[in-house]
Amino acid sequence: MQIYIISYLVSICFWIWIIMKYDKFEHEPLKTILFAFFIGGLISSLTAGIFNALFSLLINFRFAPGAAGEMSIGKSMLFFAFVGFNEEFFKAAATVLLIRKMKGFNEPADALVYAMSVAFGFSVFENLEYTMRLGLASFYIRQFNAVPLHIGLAAIWGIGIARAKYLHQGRYFRTMFPYILVAGFFHFIYNFAPLLMFYPWLSLLLPTVIAFLLIRFAIRKLKRYSEDGPFSNQLICRHCNTPNSLYAKVCKNCGEKFHLEFYRQCTSCGTKVDLQVPTCTNCGAEV
């Protein structure tokens, strides 16, 4: 039992540290991240788990080898397509429920921080079930595929949350839905593709590669949103990574033109101003 507890604590500390590390300029409070991690993870894992179970009963599908029910390719495809969308939907819904009116949600990077925290919480609760059923070996394997998968997928619909708040006047469902579909599709590929592999090592390698690419995407996106956010006092070139002043129009090193997804620059003082705001929040000039 002690090794279980230590393993989970180390995992939680590591992934929370990863999430906080790339929220570079205005760190979210640890207690708020842990709140999203625990409450959001618990809510989403319970609701998604209930609907997963109901759907498996509806189509008479059992994933466990030797269990009653059929496990044909067709039913597997249908079930994992449902699971992919279902789990991403409830993780996204729990995140919006928790943060949409939060005062600390004051830059686009925060959407990714809390989305990834909720998704990590989801993966921890999910891993408890797998570890109790299959043993500690499954826990360690899932640290290299399932956990980064959930965190990486959260960055996809986390982008939708950021765009809903900062570009679409808080129309969360309409804005997020396409991103949830994309995340659900990758989740489906992760779950279903290994069933088509002829070699056991390929069925383990493929999900790990997918998870690695997704977590790499998530970290890059979080880093970019943080660097482009209102609390950064410089512009970072996406092409050569050179820091530039807030007044820069092009990179001083490579000449790449700057483009901010959520902000425009005040020509008077260089402040990054929300696209939905007509005047600079710092000097009052029209932008």
Where would I find each of the regions flagged by the language model?
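Hydrophobic alpha-helical segments at protein termini of multi-pass membrane proteins
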Residues: 1-286
